[in-house]
Swiss-Prot record:
Keyword annotations of the record: Amino-acid biosynthesis, Arginine biosynthesis, Cytoplasm, DNA-binding, Repressor, Transcription, Transcription regulation
NCBIfam families: argR_whole
The organism's taxonomic lineage, starting at the top: Bacteria, Pseudomonadati, Chlamydiota, Chlamydiia, Chlamydiales
InterPro entries tied to this protein: Arg_repress, Arg_repress_C, Arg_repress_C_sf, Arg_repress_DNA-bd, WH-like_DNA-bd_sf, WH_DNA-bd_sf
Protein name: Arginine repressor
MF (Gene Ontology): arginine binding; DNA binding; DNA-binding transcription factor activity
Amino acid sequence: MKKNVALDKALKEILNEEGASTQEEICEKLSSLGIATTQSSVSRWLKKVHAIKIPGDKGARYSLPPSIDDSSIKHLVFSIRHNSSLIVIRTAPGSASWIASLIDNKFAESILGTLAGDDTIFITPITESTISLTAKDIENFLLVFSE
């Protein structure tokens, strides 16, 4: 098995079954499985798969985001509101970063950027004059995933 395939499989197994609170802990678990890797490689992989940290009894743990096939986004998005300068999306805890990444990729031409916390996303459109349209486009985009 190629190293990247083995690494992907092991990382998914660690996050889905055991969990880990730090990248160093993930490296240690990989090492115990005979897979040598660096913290920077783990960091890049976590970013690539949009891993999120979920609060729990033992502290925050890395987790894979729900797949679009497994869970519709409409259950993760609670509200989309805007004023004259900002769009605010409230999400389920731990999903804001993943959803913000989807929005960043889809709406790069119409937004300046997103800022995601644990359960809230702030979106700044390029122009205030199109904020209502941008908010509606984002809402329609997110609904596509929930049908």
